[in-house]
């Protein structure tokens, strides 16, 4: 494939403006899409961007995690809020974090008092707040309070014992073996089944029990050592580790909701739906952190649910959860995982989503896995997270692997579920070597994939002692780029405004499962500017119109569907209709890129064409208030110069999000993009 021309050296801005023309100086959350912000205006015959672009609302601001990680004071909270606002940041997530003194415990009166002060101060400043539902994470235990209220709500797991090798009178995984070689479960331990392995005929006992103390914990809010110094190696210092809750148990989750969500409402209800926009739940995980060896996620009565969900008796296949040499072990593990995810939807996400809907706030945050699109149907603001350098500029991870699907996962869910916003928590644990350029690249990587609410991880209340090394870096007031932050924050507001209350113009979809989104065909589409959305398979049997012309859902019309993963049975009737109409593209590893693109182009004419070709250019086309916008991002490391032909014709206005500058783009003028640069082309006077 021919790359677009690489322009060596730094691009001169005057030369750039000469190529493109003359420079001109320049609400409600939960629920369905609305339209506001105005359309492009004529000023003395000149087309200008709408007011929503020039002066975007604070509602589209970055909303950083604000790590409350040291002794708090009202004076310092107010000072930091003023600093946020002065730098263009109008929203924040109150995130209690490791380093808090013990007298500010999770949901304690002092913590609630400081939260109330921060919320009231935000209201006075026309800022907005997201509350965080755990101390610290993953969500579901209220910092151990769920288990403290009822020990039966501790995380549970399944354990296996090979009865042919276990010695009589011994203890295996906490389960006693009788003199006759049979298991003797204690109180709180339940024998699920004794089945024979298909591989060698051994008898396997499967028992469910609570995870032992010290395992399946969450990260806590207080350092183990009182006021520890920073370590010489800059490693994190130990914090307390409260026990995780059983998020597969609906009663445990109901307790969690009462202790956290209802408490928030009781304390701050006058601000719900106003200053308090949402509550953030963070990657609820079956076994929380530090899982006990040999444990498989489960809970009391889980086998009955698994059998009902799968439609067959799973009991004979239980050994496959531990032994990979059992016949079709991977298949049965996938089936069990799908059943667990279904259970989690019912016990956790559905309960919390219903509570949020009834109390006027949005459920925001993200599930545990990057392609868990199924759980996002329960979020009023579907979201995902980029942490631990899972995605990096110049690395294959931007296009390959499960993590590469996460931005499209959330934005596709937003579209198909009729939501208004989708979010991403990003930059967390990228390390002290993280740069402002990397942060901008990640932002643009998300924006061009449809994200419109960004939660930077994080702004640190304090960097005293070891706090500076807790999942670094600080990407706000304690960063080296804070003085340069305002133009960046303003650009994010413009781009999030653009991606909100707009229609994504795209006629290609890639089929996904509730817990798996394929990336290989997606990579080809990205590199050839064929935009797409992920369509979760169950939509095909729930809320789509499928006929010989394609798929219609939530205002979208997909004329082609790429199928890479094996679809579920319920989706096959709809897929048969599409296949007979010639609108199904079955991708496999033997299909080369040109064949895939040829099949796409026969069904969906290319919306944009780039000459010379460039695999580093990403394009998103949206319609907002009657105007067409093309978001164009150079995801690569080279300066690029190329001609961009769009299917929509008219006067082209080039918008610079950083400086609110716009220029007329001459019809034959090439587009020049520096590495990691993003521009927006508005089509006016069509």
Model-predicted regions and their roles:
Residues 2-24:
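N-terminal secretory signal peptides and thylakoid transit peptides that target proteins
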Residues 9, 31-47, 630:
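C-terminal segment of N-terminal export signals and the immediately downstream linker at the start
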Residues 62-63, 75-78, 91-92, 106-135, ...:
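Carbohydrate-binding surfaces of carbohydrate-active enzymes
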């Amino acid at each position: 494939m021919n790359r677009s021309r690489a322009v060596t050296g730094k691009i001169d801005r005057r030369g750039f403006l000469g190529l493109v023309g003359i420079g001109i100086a320049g609400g409600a959350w939960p629920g369905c899409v609305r339209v506001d912000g105005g359309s492009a205006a004529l000023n003395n015959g000149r087309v200008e961007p709408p007011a929503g672009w020039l002066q975007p609302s604070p509602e589209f601001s970055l909303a950083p995690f604000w790590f409350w990680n040291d002794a708090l004071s009202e004076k310092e909270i107010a000072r930091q809020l003023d600093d946020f606002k002065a730098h263009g940041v109008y929203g924040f997530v109150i995130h209690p974090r490791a380093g808090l003194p013990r007298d500010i415990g999770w949901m304690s009166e002092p913590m609630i008092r400081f939260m109330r002060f921060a919320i009231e101060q935000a209201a006075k400043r026309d800022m907005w707040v997201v509350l965080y539902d755990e101390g610290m994470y993953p969500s579901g235990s209220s910092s151990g309070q769920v288990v403290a209220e009822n020990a039966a709500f501790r995380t549970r797991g399944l354990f296996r014992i090979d009865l042919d090798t276990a010695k009589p009178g011994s203890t295996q995984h906490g389960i006693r073996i009788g003199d006759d070689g049979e298991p003797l479960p204690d109180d709180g331990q339940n024998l699920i089944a004794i089945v024979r392995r298909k591989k060698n005929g051994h008898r396997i006992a499967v028992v469910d029990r609570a995870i032992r103390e010290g395992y399946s914990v969450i990260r806590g809010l207080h350092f183990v050592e009182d006021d520890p110094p920073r370590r010489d190696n800059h490693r994190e210092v130990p914090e307390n580790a409260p026990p995780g809750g059983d998020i597969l148990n609906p009663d445990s989750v109901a307790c969690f909701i009462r202790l956290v969500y209802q408490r928030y409402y009781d304390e701050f209800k006058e601000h719900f739906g106003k200053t308090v926009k949402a509550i953030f739940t963070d990657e609820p995980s079956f076994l929380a952190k530090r899982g006990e060896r040999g444990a498989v996620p489960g809970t009391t009565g889980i086998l009955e649910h698994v059998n009902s969900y799968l439609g067959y008796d799973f009991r004979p296949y239980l050994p496959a959860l531990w032994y990979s040499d059992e016949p079709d072990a991977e298949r049965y593990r996938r089936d069990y995982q799908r059943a667990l995810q279904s259970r989690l939807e019912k016990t956790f996400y559905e309960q919390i989503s219903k509570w949020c809907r009834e109390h006027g706030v949005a459920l925001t945050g993200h599930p545990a896995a990057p392609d868990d699109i199924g759980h996002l149907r329960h979020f009023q603001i579907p979201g995902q997270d980029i942490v631990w350098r899972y995605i990096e500029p110049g690395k294959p991870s931007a296009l390959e692997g499960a993590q590469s699907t996460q931005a499209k996962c959330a934005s596709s869910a937003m579209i198909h579920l009729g939501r208004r916003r989708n979010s991403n928590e990003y930059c967390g644990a990228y390390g002290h070597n993280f740069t402002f350029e990397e942060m901008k690249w990640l932002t643009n990587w998300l924006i061009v994939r449809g994200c419109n609410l960004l939660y930077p991880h994080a702004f640190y209340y304090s960097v005293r002692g070891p706090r500076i090394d807790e999942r670094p870096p600080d990407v706000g007031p304690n960063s080296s780029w804070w003085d340069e932050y305002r133009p960046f924050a303003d650009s994010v507001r413009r781009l999030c405004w653009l991606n909100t209350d707009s229609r994504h113009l795209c006629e290609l979809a890639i089929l996904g499962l509730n817990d798996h989104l394929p990336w290989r065909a997606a990579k080809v589409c990205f590199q050839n500017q064929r935009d797409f959305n992920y369509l979760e398979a169950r939509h095909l049997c729930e809320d789509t119109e499928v006929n010989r012309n394609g798929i219609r859902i939530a205002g979208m019309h997909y004329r082609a569907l790429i199928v890479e993963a094996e679809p579920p049975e319920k989706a096959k009737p709809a897929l048969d209709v599409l296949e007979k109409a010639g609108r199904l593209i079955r991708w496999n590893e033997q299909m080369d890129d040109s064949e895939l693109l040829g099949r796409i182009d026969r069904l969906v004419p290319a919306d944009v064409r780039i000459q010379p070709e460039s695999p580093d250019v990403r394009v998103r086309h949206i319609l907002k208030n009657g105007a067409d916008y093309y978001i164009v991002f150079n995801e690569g490391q080279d300066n690029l110069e190329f001609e961009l032909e769009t299917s929509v014709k008219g006067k082209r206005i080039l918008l610079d999000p950083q400086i609110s500058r716009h220029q007329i783009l001459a019809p034959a003028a090439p587009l020049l993009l520096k590495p990691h640069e993003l521009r927006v082309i508005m089509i006016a006077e069509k």
